[in-house]
A protein has these predicted regions:
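Acidic, metal-coordinating helix/loop segments flanking the phosphotransfer/catalytic sites
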Residues: 32-48, 56
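Short acidic active-site motifs
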Residues: 36-40, 59-60, 84, 105
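Receiver (REC) domain switch/output surface
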Residues: 101, 105-121
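Two-component signal transduction core modules
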Residues: 49, 73, 96-97
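Two-component/phosphorelay signaling modules centered on CheY-like receiver
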Residues: 11-32, 36
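Alpha4 helix (beta4-alpha4-beta5 surface) of REC/receiver domains from two-component response regulators
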Residues: 77-96
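Conserved acidic segment of CheY-like receiver
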Residues: 2-13, 18, 49
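Short amphipathic alpha-helix used as the core "switch/output" element in two-component signaling
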Residues: 58-70
């Protein structure tokens, strides 16, 4: 089975862009709600989650991290700043990237999944 990533993104254009950038490396499952994300994580056991904190709350990151502590969470936002980055990290995110910088998101997911596998070994 191919490694998978679940993406929670409300904007269809950004979702397609992220899926296109992640697809060469991962099987990508797009979700549009917190409930669908949670179900997908339980069902598919992805290597990482990409979640846009512009539309979803940091408490969603905290809850996801609490429920799945070994699952890397990469957050995105149109215009992330240092304060938001720090708050997301404190909530359990592995990183925060601009949502339109697909290369940065891919690098962060690859790095986070590699670190997660190393920690599990």
């Amino acid at each position: 089975m191919a490694q998978s990533v679940v993406v929670l993104e409300k904007d269809p254009g950004v979702a397609r862009s992220l899926a296109g950038g992640l697809h060469p490396h991962f099987s990508v499952h797009l979700t549009g709600s917190r409930e669908e994300l949670h179900e997908s994580v339980l069902r598919d056991r992805p290597e990482a989650v990409v979640l846009n904190i512009e539309y979803w709350r940091l408490t969603d990151v905290e809850s996801l991290h609490h429920d799945f502590p070994k699952l890397p969470i990469v957050c995105t936002h149109r215009i992330p700043d240092e304060e938001m980055w720090m708050a997301a990290l404190e909530a359990g995110a592995a990183d925060v990237c601009p949502s339109d910088d697909v290369g940065n998101v891919l690098t962060s997911v690859l790095r986070s999944t590699a670190m997660s596998r190393t920690a599990a070994a």
